[in-house]
Structure formats: structure tokens, C-alpha cells
UniProtKB/Swiss-Prot annotation:
Name of the protein in question: Copine-5
Binding-site residues, Ca(2+) 5: 192, 254, 256, 262
Residue numbers of Phosphoserine PTMs: 19, 103, 140
Binding site for Ca(2+) 4: 192, 198, 254, 256
Species of provenance: Mus musculus (Mouse)
Gene name as annotated: Cpne5
Its job: Probable calcium-dependent phospholipid-binding protein that may play a role in calcium-mediated intracellular processes. Plays a role in dendrite formation by melanocytes.
Length: 593
């Protein structure tokens, strides 16, 4: 059946489709002690940055700095501005060249070395400043064909150290701005047969490709044609992605109980226009295009007026990270008998010589991203639901490395090693109790509440939770502490209880006490199993979904406690670049490569 005109389907309003765009960071590049390839002077360096596609793993050139004449210690002026996603592994590559001509073909220039890292590594380093040695690998990529070619063809020696690259990340200032505004409307069209309209506004930001993404929806004002909506706040990047002149579309609807909301009309504006505040420039005619086409005398379907507008700068996730906040990562693994005998291929704990099991895949996907925000890379790893040697005592909080005093493992590989070792020594048993591991991490989080540390607990489980009441109480208590909980459900069990713990729809409570914050994120592993066998891509999606809420959860805790970000640590003193004989240090050559 064709939808009546001026009606919108419920699905358009089910959720705020399209996440807030990532914050943008500016990467600054410096190098020290580059190889000297020029016979009678120093090298003329250029840095090329590449990003790697998540799906095809191909390196794509992102941009180039300027060429700096006659120096082995360049401080490049031209920056790289990139979108930052905490929840994604954003691989970067930096190639250095000594430019010998005006040719844009990189194979015409001497290769000086390269470095690989992730954006998270740069951001998570002390002061968001990362130093890495430049090396000449066995292969580099031909800039024209994209195919590997021997790096030695440019005169390098594979594996040789070629100086140091220094990468600094700075969040762009307009990414931290939050706009607060209020609107009212006057003489909106009457849509309800037995009463006035029930109007609400829907805001959309425009995308680069001309499409629109919903970014805010006001509350519904019942039975009025002259509504005054409540004041609301929204990150500027959500409204316009930092582009002050980008179109913002606002649609006006009449709410209907059955979800088939009636379209009243629309108008467009921009952040720059809104920032003028209350004025004649911010009174908008609400236009219904279909009515305008059909009726010659049509004027408008009412007006919407901006009553107030203010913008302030808020502390962001990256402010806290740059100020030294460490993310303490702990993993807890389900060793209950419902996983199946680890020696059999049907077991969720089966260790195939050919591929990682679901537990190891989930752990690696989350761990390899979060590890860069913990400077010592020592991660506590716990197990629950097993009988331990030598006496068969059932434990719901045992160290995978067997060390009761210090359950920390060195890196993600250390956790995997301890996990595999535990499978050979403990007996899978039960029941599935979460409360002990939640309480364990909460105890550590409670010990440091000055903003210098934030704990993230990853629980990987296969079964129906056995201690729901105790777990709810532990989570409600943990919600006032600097910690978040990620739960990944593996296997084919029903995970209804996990969805309840997630608290996206209904905030969890215990003994009549509501959790102060939503700190739990749950995903079922089976939703990410790629039938094509592309585990890399499917696990990247899993990590993205479970980690996406962590930055906001960290900031919400800090704000609730009144904790401001600390100033970034001072950068270590560098030896000043040596001035070349006939060119000031850092003077760019006017050659566009």
C-alpha cells in the first residue's frame, strides 16, 4: 500500500541513525638524524603518510608534507588531519624520501626509511607524542602501481636504522565545542482531526555525498501549534562535522501514536547562522514542498524561531588521555563445563593449530586496540567457573598465570599464553558467576579515583548467568567508580540476561538503587562471524561495537566527579636541529611533490 503523503515511517525515528563523527586530530611530523643521501649537501626530506583500508588491507596515500631543503632534522610544517576513532585499529605508515627533482613520482627519489604505527599508539603515548626508529624494510611500495618493490633499489640497506621519526597528535579545537540552543514555533499547520498538532523537530547534518544523517530529535510538545521546546546540547561535530557553513536540515513533524508521524514542513540553516543567536536571521519559515507545488497561495506551514544559542568548550576523551589517564585492561574468561571438552573440536575452548577460537579472537580484537592506552602493557587475566588443582576447589576469580599475588600478563600475547596454559591445568566446571570478577576489578578501580586511571573489564562467556542478583549489585556499585564492562557472548546460548545488564533501554538497578551510569556493553560473538572466513574484518567490527562507548563512559565519570584533565607532560628536550650551511632550518622548498 502506498504511504499517504506527508507521512513518515516509524523506522526513520527508531534511533539516531549514524554515529557522531569522530573527533579530528592533527598529526605533526618531525625527524632526527635522517640518512644523508646528497653528495655535497644534506638531504631534502619529504614525508608521505599512508592509511590502510580495513577491508582490503591496501595502503593508500593520505598526504605529503612540504619538502624541506638541506636538513637531516626536519620539523615539517604541513600537518595531516585525520578522523580519530578510539574503537578502531587505524594503521598508519610514514615514508621518508630525499627529493632530487620536481617529479611527483616517488620512485624517482631516494628512500630514506619508514615507520609503521596506529593512530591509537600516537594518541596513547605520553603527551600524545610517539618516537619510532625509521627503518628500511625489505620492500616498499611503488607509488604508481601500488606493488611492492625492493627498498634496496633506492639505495637502502634492509633493516638498517635510518634515524628517528617523532609523531605528535593534537585534537582540533572545534571538535570539543558543544552548542546549547532552544527553539520555539508559531502557527504550525494543524494535523490532528480532533485536536492541535503534537510537534517535534528532527535535525540532520549534511554529508559530503549530499545525503543527510539524523543528529538530534527534540521532545514532543502535546496539543499545540505554538510549541516551546526544551533547551538541548549537542556536540558541534555532530551538528556539522566542524564545517560551520555545512547545511543543517530541520524537519517538523506531528507525532502520532502509531508511529506514522505527519510531516509538517522543513527548513535549512547552518552552524554559522545559528551562532548569530536570537535575531531576525534566525526566524525560519517552515515549508512543505508538496503543498507549495500544489497551492499557488501557499505561504508557509508556520515558523520556527531560535530563542537562544551558546557554545562552550568541553573536556574530551583525548584531553584526559593526553593528560596521562591510563586505561587498565582486565580480561575474565569463562571456564564453565558448558563450553565443552577443550580437547574436542566442538568445544568453544578447542585450540586448533590452524586458527584462534572465539575466546582468543574476541580477546585479541579488543586487546590490540586498548593496549596502546596502558603504558606498562601488563594486563590482569582472570578465569571463572573452574576447579583448580591440586584439590579441585571451584573458583570464580583465579589468575590465568597461576600467580595469586600478581595476575598480570605481559601484553595480549601473554594473556593468550596464560589462557592456553590454564586450559591444560584446570577442570571446566560451573556455575557462571560474574560478580566475583566484577568486584575484583571494582576493588582496584576504587583504589585510584583521582582521574589518573580508568579500568575496562572484558568478560568473555558462553552461558546463562547464574548469579544475576549479585552481578547486578556489583555493577550498580561499580557504576560510581572509574570503570566500564564489556561482555562478549560466544556460542549459541540465549543471552537475554546480558541484554538486561547492558542497560541501553532500562538502566539496571539493585535493591531499589539505580546505577549512576550505564557502564556495560554486550555483544553476541555470533553476530560477527563472517561466513567468508574473513576474521580480520569481522573482529574489527566486533571491536568497534564494544569499544565505541568507552570514551563517553570515561568522560561521563570524570565530569560527574568534577575531575578536569591534567596538563600534558612536557615533551623531552631534543637536541636542536643542526643549521645547514646555506639554508635556515626548516625552510620549505617551493617544490610541490
Amino acid at each position: 500500500m502506498e504511504q499517504p503523503e506527508d507521512m513518515a515511517s516509524l523506522s526513520e525515528f527508531d534511533s539516531l541513525a549514524g554515529s557522531i563523527p569522530a573527533t579530528k586530530v592533527e598529526i605533526t611530523v618531525s625527524c632526527r638524524n635522517l640518512l644523508d643521501k646528497d653528495m655535497f649537501s644534506k638531504s631534502d626530506p619529504l614525508c608521505v603518510m599512508y592509511t590502510q583500508g580495513m577491508e582490503n588491507k591496501q595502503w593508500r596515500e593520505f598526504g605529503r608534507t612540504e619538502v624541506i631543503d638541506n636538513t637531516l632534522n626536519p620539523d615539517f610544517v604541513r600537518k595531516f588531519i585525520v578522523d580519530y576513532f578510539f574503537e578502531e585499529k587505524q594503521n598508519l605508515r610514514f615514508d621518508l624520501y630525499d627529493v632530487d627533482s620536481k617529479s611527483p613520482d616517488l620512485s624517482k627519489h631516494d628512500f630514506l626509511g619508514q615507520a609503521f604505527c596506529t593512530l591509537g599508539e600516537i594518541v596513547g603515548s605520553s603527551g600524545s607524542r610517539l618516537e619510532k626508529p625509521l627503518t628500511i624494510g625489505t620492500f616498499s611500495l611503488n607509488s604508481r602501481t601500488g606493488k611492492p618493490m625492493p627498498a634496496v633499489s633506492n639505495g637502502g640497506v634492509p633493516g638498517k636504522k635510518c634515524g628517528t621519526i617523532i609523531l605528535s597528535a593534537e585534537e582540533l579545537s572545534n571538535c570539543r565545542d558543544v552548542a546549547t540552543m532552544q527553539f520555539c514555533a508559531n502557527k504550525l499547520d494543524k494535523k490532528d482531526f480532533f485536536g492541535k498538532s503534537d510537534p517535534f523537530l528532527v535535525f540532520y547534518r549534511s554529508n559530503e555525498d549530499g545525503t543527510f544523517t539524523i543528529c538530534h530529535k527534540t521532545e514532543v510538545m502535546k496539543n499545540t501549534l505554538n510549541p516551546v521546546w526544551q533547551t538541548f546540547s549537542i556536540p558541534v561535530r555532530a551538528l556539522c562535522n566542524g564545517d560551520y557553513d555545512r547545511t543543517i536540515k530541520v524537519e517538523v513533524y506531528d507525532w502520532d501514536r502509531d508511529g506514522s508521524h505527519d510531516f509538517i514542513g522543513e527548513f535549512t540553516t547552518s552552524y554559522r547562522e545559528l551562532a548569530r543567536g536570537q535575531s531576525q536571521f534566525n526566524i525560519y519559515e517552515v515549508i512543505n514542498p508538496k503543498k507549495k507545488m500544489k497551492k499557488k497561495k501557499y505561504v508557509n506551514s508556520g515558523t520556527v524561531t531560535l530563542l537562544s544559542f551558546a557554545v562552550e568548550s568541553e573536556s574530551t576523551f583525548l584531553d584526559y588521555i593526553k593528560g596521562g589517564t591510563q586505561i587498565n585492561f582486565t580480561v575474565a574468561i569463562d571456564f564453565t563445563a558448558s563450553n565443552g571438552n577443550p580437547s574436542q573440536s566442538t568445544s568453544l575452548h578447542y585450540m586448533s593449530p590452524y586458527q584462534l577460537n572465539a575466546y582468543a579472537l574476541a580477546l585479541t580484537a579488543v586487546g590490540e586496540i586498548i593496549q596502546h592506552y596502558d603504558s606498562d602493557k601488563m594486563f590482569p587475566a582472570l578465569g571463572f567457573g573452574a576447579k583448580l588443582p591440586p584439590d579441585g576447589r571451584v573458583s570464580h576469580e583465579f589468575p590465568l598465570n597461576g600467580n595469586q599475588e600478581n595476575p598480570s600478563c605481559c601484553g595480549i600475547d601473554g594473556i593468550l599464553e596464560a589462557y592456553h596454559s590454564s586450559l591444560r591445568t584446570v577442570q571446566l566446571y560451573g556455575p557462571t558467576n560474574f560478580a566475583p570478577v566484577v568486584t575484583h576489578v571494582a576493588r582496584n578501580a576504587a583504589a585510584v579515583q583521582d582521574g589518573s586511571q580508568y579500568s575496562v573489564l572484558l568478560i568473555i562467556t558462553d552461558g546463562v548467568i547464574s548469579d544475576m542478583a549479585q552481578t547486578k549489585e556489583a555493577i550498580v556499585n561499580a557504576a560510581k567508580l572509574p570503570m566500564s564492562i564489556i561482555i562478549v557472548g560466544v556460542g549459541q546460548a540465549e543471552f537475554d540476561a546480558m541484554v538486561e545488564l547492558d542497560g541501553d533501554d532500562v538502566r539496571i538497578s539493585s535493591r531499589g538503587k539505580l546505577a549512576e551510569r550505564d557502564i556495560v556493553q554486550f555483544v553476541p560473538f555470533r553476530d560477527y562471524v563472517d561466513r567468508t572466513g574473513n576474521h580480520v574484518l569481522s573482529m574489527a567490527r566486533l571491536a568497534r561495537d564494544v569499544l565505541a562507548e568507552i570514551p563517553d563512559q570515561l568522560v561521563s565519570y570524570m565530569k560527574a566527579q568534577g575531575i578536569r584533565p591534567r596538563p600534558p607532560p612536557a615533551a623531552p628536550a631534543q637536541s636542536p636541529p643542526q643549521s645547514p650551511a646555506h639554508s635556515p632550518p626548516g625552510s620549505p622548498v617551493h617544490t610541490h611533490i
